[in-house]
From Swiss-Prot:
Name of the protein in its database record: GMP synthase [glutamine-hydrolyzing]
The Glutamine amidotransferase type-1 domain, residue ranges: 7-197
PANTHER family: GMP SYNTHASE [GLUTAMINE-HYDROLYZING], GMP SYNTHASE-RELATED
One cellular component term from this protein's GO annotations in UniProt: cytosol
Catalytic activity, EC: 6.3.5.2
Subunit structure: Homodimer.
Active site (UniProt): 84 (nucleophile), 171, 173
The entry's keywords: ATP-binding, Glutamine amidotransferase, GMP biosynthesis, Ligase, Nucleotide-binding, Purine biosynthesis
Residues noted as binding ATP in the record, renumbered to the chain: 225-231
PROSITE patterns: GATASE_TYPE_1, GMPS_ATP_PPASE
Organism domain of life: Bacteria
Amino acid sequence: MQNNIDKVLILDFGSQFTQLITRRIRELNVYSEIHPFHVSIDFIKEFKPKAIILSGGPSSVYEEDAPKVDKQLFELGMPILGICYGMQIIVYSMGGKVESADKREYGKAEIEITNHESIFKSFGKSNIVWMSHGDSIKSIPEGFELIAKTPNTELAAIENKQKNIYAIQFHPEVVHTENGIKIIENFLFNICKCERNWNMGSFIEYEIKRIRETVGDKNVILGLSGGVDSSVAAVLIEKAIGKQLKCIFVNNGLLRKDEDKKVVEVFRDNFNIDLIYVDASKRFLDKLAGVTDPEQKRKVIGHEFVSVFNDEAKKIENVGFLAQGTLYPDVIESVSLRGSSAVIKSHHNVGGLPKDMKFELLEPFRELFKDEVREIGLELKLPEDIVYRQPFPGPGLAVRILGDITEERVKILQEADDIVVSEIKKAGLYRKLWQSFAILLPVKSVGVMGDGRTYEQVCAVRAVESVDAMTADWAKIDYNVLGIISNRIINEVKGINRVVYDISSKPPATIEWE
């Protein structure tokens, strides 16, 4: 990462909201990174953070195996903000007392602010916050003073101005906390004196230079899928090394309608990228014949992709690097509480490449979130319909065709899915929804068309709202829009005579049907 920008170090104790803290800070144009709570003091000194934040977590600090920090952390002179468990670890480590609460506090609560300086600067007398804790602080360490309380939590926020340590028993990073961003702003800019010097324009400049220095005269191969991450990576890397980038686009016969044509048009024709297009649709469909089990479908597709990709990669000379669109959440997921030695997850398409293909990985986005990658895509003039494209499963339409996969059933689903996406866009809903798509079911139903009886396939429509795909709510789409989608599919797609709408949330259902 660039050395000339201010950085915030977030020590992770296992909170479900830790990534949200990072995102909130980056939205304020300050760079932040998450690392496990047990990183060494030497690592912290070398990282040179402008501020340190201790995240929440599910543990109780007084338990023997609870995550702890080196007490030297509090003597470094760096500003520290503890959130929820982070507050409790500060109190416990510095001589205060934490016990199981008589009354747990979950959900919204009203804090009374007793000190309107530091993190509560420009606040009113009270504020609604989001609590999530089963332990409470009974006494605070020497040098700390109370700055906020609730009816159930006498010590809801404390500070030690001399040591520049602040701690709060609630979550400012969640939307349920009113003025939560203001608390983070006060900490970053009034207390830590951070500069707003993290932006995608400077990242692009830095990364182009880094890619050139890293790659040298070697060629780079990238599996282009047409999705957001690989598309933006392709354009950024091409900007750095030009024709040294070789993109391999495999048509597995399970893509969205006309997707192969669109990918070739955008990347080969508009961006002049060296694109190798492989039509392996027959090969994939032959291998999938008679396969109905979802996991088996994934295995067959994964194996075939690796085989096709390998065949094409071997034809390219002087390859030194394999580029992937790995994102920061993948990295966090792999290294957080388990320690930095954990293996980083690989992209599903290339994770199984043979070991004799000794390429180094080139991952330009491994420190970025999806919204930051989209911002880069816009800066690089990628079409908005690619930048804001909804997530699409790696195995493609194979996991949206329940039962047998045939060329005919793929074409039926492509047409139905194209209608769903088209009408969702017309209604102005596409960017508001996490995903919206059609599923072809392995059942037929009786219908009537004109004077005749029909016995054709059933199509389900799925649309969900989500932030991170970990949880999702089914979208309450206007009945008129659903009616148009249903009528168009039944009238325009030969082979479907009934459309149903999926009203399942995640959990208990998953977003995809398989």
